[in-house]
Amino acid sequence: IAYSLKLLGGEPLPMAMLGSDGADYLQRLESLDIDCRHVGQVQDTYTAQAMIMTDRDNNQITAFHPGAMMQAHANRIDVGAKASVGIIAPDGRDAMLEHAAQFVAAGIPFVFDPGQGLPMFSGEELAKFIDQASWVTVNDYEGKMLSDRTGWTLAEISRKVEGLVVTLGAEGCEVWVAGEKTHVPAVVPKQVVDPTGCGDAWRGALLFGLERGWALPRCAALGNRVGALKIAQRGPQNYTLDFAVE
């Protein structure tokens, strides 16, 4: 997410916990001029690792070890923190709950994007996240689960926040605002090489647009465009922009 946001011209402030093996990755972020003041390190444990297996149809199975991520709640968002917008993306369970409350206390609007972390939470907890958030983003599968667990339709969820986005992969995405749905078409990539990191590329673009006060469909369209660039390159941090952001 931070790579995408920085590439577009934003100034990300990632909050994360690395393990004792994380020095090279921290150096990588710093080489990209990404501010790492909120990246901590936990000794005697490994950095979170995901092994993602992708078939020829781009279906994926992920094996995940959380490692130091389980201590991510030790990072705190102070009441006086200065940020335009934040995101609650997949993280340790305690960190997601606590950081959402801390965003609210600091008066920082945020996106709730639970991703693969969604099954960790009860319907009551998910409802509270939605009440705290300014925006919600999910894929179509997560959207169904979110509706099932909260008992709210997508239209109802969209009325509780400033906007809801449901990503649909190659079909683009649906933007819900005040109960009304708008389809934002996908951008056709030059080639399909590797889907790993497409969601994070999209998230970074979303944050870039929200920080600038763009309407949600415009933010989603930029996300689709950056995601199309990412999928044409192998690896989550090897793509570059082929356009200027206006």
Describe the predicted segments one by one:
Residues 14, 37-42, 50-94:
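Conserved phosphate-binding/catalytic loop of the ribokinase/pfkB sugar-kinase fold
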Residues 1-49:
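Substrate-binding N-lobe of the ribokinase-like
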Residues 98, 104-185:
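Conserved phosphate/ATP/ADP-binding segment of small-molecule kinases
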Residues 20, 44, 65-69, 114-118, ...:
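Short, acidic/turn-prone active-site loops that include or flank metal/cofactor-
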Residues 6, 104, 211:
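Gly/Ala-rich phosphate-binding loop of Rossmann-like dinucleotide-binding domains
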